[in-house]
Curated annotation (Swiss-Prot):
Cofactor(s) of this protein: Mg(2+)
Protein name: Crossover junction endodeoxyribonuclease RuvC
Pfam families given in the database record: RuvC
Main location as per UniProt: cytoplasm
High-level lineage: Bacteria, Pseudomonadati, Pseudomonadota, Alphaproteobacteria, Maricaulales
Binding site for Mg(2+) 2: 71
Length: 166
């Protein structure tokens, strides 16, 4: 019987943070849960970051993932937006790290290429492929992106483990 691994995928954002938990058993993937965390937009930045941190911590306790994966920051035209996204990423990464989980980071283009086959895929294409790869899953764009990040990690962790076993 194949070892079962749970992966928490995180699509970071200060307004909407998508999350998804998948189970990997050999080459089989299945969705466990997914959703979106929405910090109060009127709250100060520190409170919104604490909301993200606490929410991810709750997800780790509730779903018991073995590993986590998050989308890397990308270069935005607006430096202030990029900095705030970096804060959100840090808050989201710290909770699983604090629980002792390894946290992998993947570029958005690699996630899209891993799930759709092209790094230039749009959100609708990612969501459609997530629905195919995880049958019965109907996720919003942010949650679908998080599930895609988890799927990307499942593929890359398997390739890494196969490479190290050779």
């Amino acid at each position: 019987m194949a070892l079962s691994v749970r992966i928490l995928g995180i699509d970071p954002g200060l307004r909407r943070m998508g999350w998804g938990v998948i189970r990997v058993e050999g080459s089989r993937l299945s969705a466990i849960a997914h959703g979106v965390v929405t910090p109060p937009t009127a709250a100060p930045l520190s409170e919104r970051l604490m909301h993200l941190f606490n929410s991810v911590g709750d997800l780790v306790r509730q779903h018991g993932p073995d590993e986590a994966a998050i989308e890397e920051a990308f270069m935005a035209a607006n430096a202030a937006s990029a900095l705030k996204l970096g804060h959100a990423r840090a808050a989201a990464m710290l909770a699983p790290a604090r629980a002792g989980l390894p946290v992998a980071e993947y570029a958005a283009r690699l996630v899209k290429k891993s799930v759709v086959g092209t790094g230039a895929a749009d959100k609708a294409q990612v969501a459609a492929m997530v629905g195919i790869l995880l049958p019965g899953t109907k996720a919003t764009a942010d949650a679908a992106d998080a599930l895609a990040i988890a799927i990307c990690h499942a593929h890359h962790r398997r390739a890494t483990s196969l490479g190290s076993a050779a």
